[in-house]
Structure formats: C-alpha cells, structure tokens
C-alpha cells in the first residue's frame, strides 16, 4: 500500500529512498545497482523496496464505513 518509513527488521529509514528507486528502475537501470547507489546494503532493507507493491490507488475506490 504505502511504503513504510522504516525497515521492519532493522529500523533504518528507507521511505525517502523509494521514489528515487522507483524512478531509476522504471528508466531501465538494474535494481541491484540502484539499491547499492542508494546505500541499502542490508538484505532486509533491500527486500522492503524490491517487494513493495503500490495498491493505494486501487484501494481508494472502496468506501470506508
């Protein structure tokens, strides 16, 4: 849904890196190189960005009661 601000495992701040990661990967760069450039070396932080799925736009169509 919404990218978490911190890594669930180690607590490192990762929320500020998501849009840069997304932009560069969509431009055709290798995700491994992008994560290295962003300073995400721990596999727990890397999985947070690699496995994230944007669902907020789909969920907003439903009403909350």
From Swiss-Prot:
Which residues are noted in the entry as Zn(2+)-binding?
7, 10, 44-45
Which reactions does this protein catalyse?
Answer: RNA(n) + a ribonucleoside 5'-triphosphate = RNA(n+1) + diphosphate
User: Would the keyword Nucleotidyltransferase be found if you checked this record's keyword annotation?
Assistant: yes
State the SUPFAM superfamilies in the record. Answer: RNA polymerase subunit RPB10
Q: Which coenzymes or cofactors are required?
A: Zn(2+)
Q: By its UniProt entry, which InterPro entries does this protein fall under?
A: RNA_pol_su_RPB10, RNA_pol_suN_Zn-BS, RPABC5/Rpb10
Q: Which GO terms describe its cellular component?
A: cytoplasm; DNA-directed RNA polymerase complex
Keywords from the UniProt entry: Cytoplasm, DNA-directed RNA polymerase, Metal-binding, Nucleotidyltransferase, Transcription, Transferase, Zinc
Its function, per the record, reads: DNA-dependent RNA polymerase (RNAP) catalyzes the transcription of DNA into RNA using the four ribonucleoside triphosphates as substrates.
- Give the protein's recorded name: DNA-directed RNA polymerase subunit Rpo10
The organism encoding this protein is: Pyrococcus horikoshii (strain ATCC 700860 / DSM 12428 / JCM 9974 / NBRC 100139 / OT-3)
Gene name linked to the record: rpo10
């Amino acid at each position: 849904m919404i990218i978490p601000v911190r890594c669930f495992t180690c607590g490192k701040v990762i929320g500020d890196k998501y849009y840069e990661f997304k932009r560069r990967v969509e431009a055709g760069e290798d995700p491994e190189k992008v994560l290295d450039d962003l300073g995400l070396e721990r596999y727990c932080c890397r999985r947070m960005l690699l496995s994230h799925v944007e669902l907020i736009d789909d969920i907003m169509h439903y009403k909350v009661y």
